[in-house]
From Swiss-Prot:
Family according to the record: Belongs to the TAF7 family.
Organism: Mus musculus
Keyword annotations from UniProtKB, A to Z: Coiled coil, Cytoplasm, Developmental protein, Differentiation, Nucleus, Phosphoprotein, Spermatogenesis, Transcription, Transcription regulation
PANTHER family assigned: TRANSCRIPTION INITIATION FACTOR TFIID 55 KD SUBUNIT-RELATED, TRANSCRIPTION INITIATION FACTOR TFIID SUBUNIT 7-LIKE
Top-level taxon of origin: Eukaryota
Localization: Nucleus; Cytoplasm
Reported function: Probably functions as a spermatogenesis-specific component of the DNA-binding general transcription factor complex TFIID, a multimeric protein complex that plays a central role in mediating promoter responses to various activators and repressors. May play a role in spermatogenesis.
GO cellular component, one term: transcription factor TFIID complex
Region (Disordered): 1-84, 192-211, 328-377
Biased composition, class Acidic residues, residue ranges: 347-377
Protein's gene: Taf7l
In-chain residues carrying the UniProt-annotated modification Phosphoserine: 199
Name of protein: Transcription initiation factor TFIID subunit 7-like
Subunit structure: TFIID is composed of TATA binding protein (TBP) and a number of TBP-associated factors (TAFs). TAF7L may replace TAF7 in a spermatogenesis-specific form of TFIID. Interacts with TBP; the interaction occurs in a sub-population of cells (pachytene and haploid round spermatids) and is developmentally regulated through differential intracellular localization of the two proteins. Interacts with TAF1.
Length: 471
């Protein structure tokens, strides 16, 4: 033990060392420290006690264990009984534990905002860790608790304690891996430069009417110390941008008269109806739906969900027609037809496959026709250019053959457009949804324009062919 080892080094007899080993913690009681120290100072003045008072104020939890371990003090404590020593030991242990618990409580912190010069000086003081520099930073609060005077290196700055828009968590770490929360920071001490008047952070607008003064004084006092910005530049004016109160628009008198309060009282029945419709949708074998436009909602009757059975042929045909409509609109080639094929007969499956094959063949034929038409137009244009340069030596037979081929291809393309337009007309008859009708009407209008253009091109080529045949 420490006290047992210190006694021989100071030249004390072995008897004093044994006495200290029996009751090493007796000097920890604060009451006995004062009395024994005085006795030791009066009886044995030769023991040096200069550095001891300096170390007694270092920490808060070792206050009662810093008595000078002198032999005279140990001899003067031979008289107390063993039970009294144990009681004093328990009391001192409890006191030291309470002091340690108080030291680990949550701290009270605030942010100190200083001008650049003073901030640099405070940062230098903190990093130096010199105890002699601790007097260069002082903060004196006024009795109201919201105003203060901050003194940094003999420079006094007026300061105001303001409330931040939100709470900031303060953390500390020792190894830069594990963080411990120390406080919740919600206030900031803002220091203004020396000689500059400190403006309030948020000046409320207070009405001067006699009836409003009493109500607005409390709000004005609260808003007086509210800081409307955050601590970083992106949070400028964040109290109004992010944390402002939502304004409620008051309806006009005419709107209040038009409000039907029965709609609000019937909300439970509406919820029951919605649940019933959802249950019916879940139990249905197949469901029909349509996209309803808000403008035409009054003209269209909502069809809702209709549960059907495989025995009803009309609904089966209707579902197939809907499938054909969506396939035509999205350009699908029959890859998503598994659900429809399971509910149709074998004959319907064969018909669908034949239709898909025809659609695929028509699309392929259209692509080939377009490519050949473009090539023939380029070839004919080149021949026209050669004919204009060498009119006498040019043979008309090659030009007439090219014109005839181009007329044939354009007539074939015209037939395809005509068939497509007829199919769009059939789809328009089957579809009941106005949105789909509008889509197919637009497609049909484009096909009619293409049909007119092809007819004009064919007529122009026929006139050119007549001219070359006459020559």
């Amino acid at each position: 033990m420490e006290r047992g080892e210190e006694a021989p080094t100071e030249g004390a007899p072995p008897e004093g060392a044994l006495v200290e080993a029996k009751a090493p913690v007796i000097p920890e009681a604060p009451a006995t420290d004062v009395s024994t120290t005085e006795e030791a100072g009066s009886k044995e003045p030769q023991v040096p006690s200069g550095p001891r008072p300096e170390g007694a104020g270092d920490t808060c939890d070792t206050r009662g264990a810093r008595g000078p371990p002198t032999p005279g003090r140990a001899k003067s404590q031979k008289t107390p009984r063993q039970g009294t020593a144990r009681c004093q030991t328990l009391e001192s242990a409890m006191r030291s534990m309470s002091v340690r618990l108080e030291c680990h409580d949550v701290e009270e912190q605030f942010i100190l905002r200083l001008p650049p010069e003073q901030a640099y000086a405070v940062r230098k003081i903190i990093h130096s860790r010199n105890a002699a520099w601790k007097d260069k930073l002082k903060i004196d609060f006024s009795p109201d608790g919201h105003h203060a005077v901050v003194q940094v290196d003999n420079v006094s700055l007026p300061a105001k304690l303001v409330n931040l828009p939100c709470v900031i968590g303060s953390l500390k770490t020792i190894d830069r891996k594990t963080f411990y929360k120390t406080a919740d920071v919600s206030q900031m001490l803002v220091c203004s430069p020396e000689g500059e008047p400190h403006s309030p952070p948020e000046e409320p607008v207070v009405s001067t009417g006699p009836t409003v003064i009493g109500i607005s004084e409390g709000k004005a006092e609260r808003k007086k110390y509210n800081w409307k910005h955050g601590i970083t530049p992106p949070l400028k004016n964040v109290r109004k941008k992010r944390f402002r109160k939502t304004t409620k628009k008051l309806p006009d008198v005419k709107q209040v008269d038009e409000i039907n309060f029965s709609e609000y009282t019937q909300s439970p029945s509406v919820e029951k109806e919605v649940k019933r419709l959802l249950y019916s949708d879940a139990e249905a074998v197949s469901v029909r739906w349509e996209v309803v436009d808000d403008d035409d909602a009054k003209e269209i009757e909502s069809q809702g969900s209709m549960p059907t059975t495989p025995g009803i042929s009309q609904m089966g045909g209707a579902s197939l027609s809907d499938y054909d409509v969506f396939r035509e609109m999205m350009g699908d080639s029959g890859s998503n037809s598994n659900d429809v094929e399971e509910k149709s007969n074998e004959g319907d499956d064969d018909d669908d496959e034949d239709e898909d094959d025809e659609d695929y063949g028509n699309e392929k034929e259209e692509e080939e026709t377009d490519n050949s038409e473009e090539e023939l137009e380029k070839e004919l244009q080149a021949k026209f250019n050669e004919f204009s340069l060498h009119e006498a030596d040019q043979d008309y037979s090659s030009i007439t053959m090219a014109i005839q081929k181009l007329i044939f291809i354009k007539e074939k393309r015209l037939q395809m457009i005509y068939k497509k337009a007829q199919r769009q007309k059939e789809l328009l008859r089957k579809v009941e949804n106005l949105t789909l009708k509008r889509h197919f009407q637009n497609v049909l209008g484009k096909l009619n324009i293409m049909e007119k253009e092809k007819c004009e091109q064919i007529y122009h080529l026929q006139e050119q062919l007549k001219c070359f045949l006459k020559e």
